[in-house]
């Protein structure tokens, strides 16, 4: 995230500022971090589609086919 030091000993960032605004902008929540969440979700979705496709392929060509 940003280079600001957290006031908490374990490095947490408070969810809200004293005036009620979010402590971290929404844009930063989706684009900062070790890996962006959208990238992880895209890779996971592609993996699920691949596995489901593999099952359908196997059902037509493998032991389960008539």
Swiss-Prot record:
It holds the Pfam family PsbJ. InterPro entries: PSII_PsbJ, PSII_PsbJ_sf. Gene3D superfamilies: 6.10.250.2070. Its main location: membrane. The keyword Heme does not apply. It is found in: Cellular thylakoid membrane. One of its GO terms (biological process) is photosynthesis. Residues 1-23 are annotated as: Disordered. It is a single-pass membrane protein. The chain crosses the membrane at residues 37-57. GO terms for cellular component: photosystem II reaction center; plasma membrane-derived thylakoid membrane. Keywords: Membrane, Photosynthesis, Photosystem II, Reaction center, Thylakoid, Transmembrane, Transmembrane helix. PSII is composed of 1 copy each of membrane proteins PsbA, PsbB, PsbC, PsbD, PsbE, PsbF, PsbH, PsbI, PsbJ, PsbK, PsbL, PsbM, PsbT, PsbX, PsbY, PsbZ, Psb30/Ycf12, peripheral proteins PsbO, CyanoQ (PsbQ), PsbU, PsbV and a large number of cofactors. It forms dimeric complexes. One of the components of the core complex of photosystem II (PSII). PSII is a light-driven water:plastoquinone oxidoreductase that uses light energy to abstract electrons from H(2)O, generating O(2) and a proton gradient subsequently used for ATP formation. It consists of a core antenna complex that captures photons, and an electron transfer chain that converts photonic excitation into a charge separation. NCBIfam families: PRK02565.1 (NF002722). Belongs to the PsbJ family. This is Photosystem II reaction center protein J.
């Amino acid at each position: 995230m940003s280079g600001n030091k957290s006031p908490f000993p374990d490095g947490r960032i408070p969810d809200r500022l004293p005036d009620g605004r979010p402590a971290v902008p929404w844009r930063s929540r989706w684009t900062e971090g070790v890996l962006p969440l959208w990238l992880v979700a895209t890779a996971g979705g592609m993996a699920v589609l691949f596995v489901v496709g593999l099952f359908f392929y196997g059902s037509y060509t493998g032991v389960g086919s008539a």
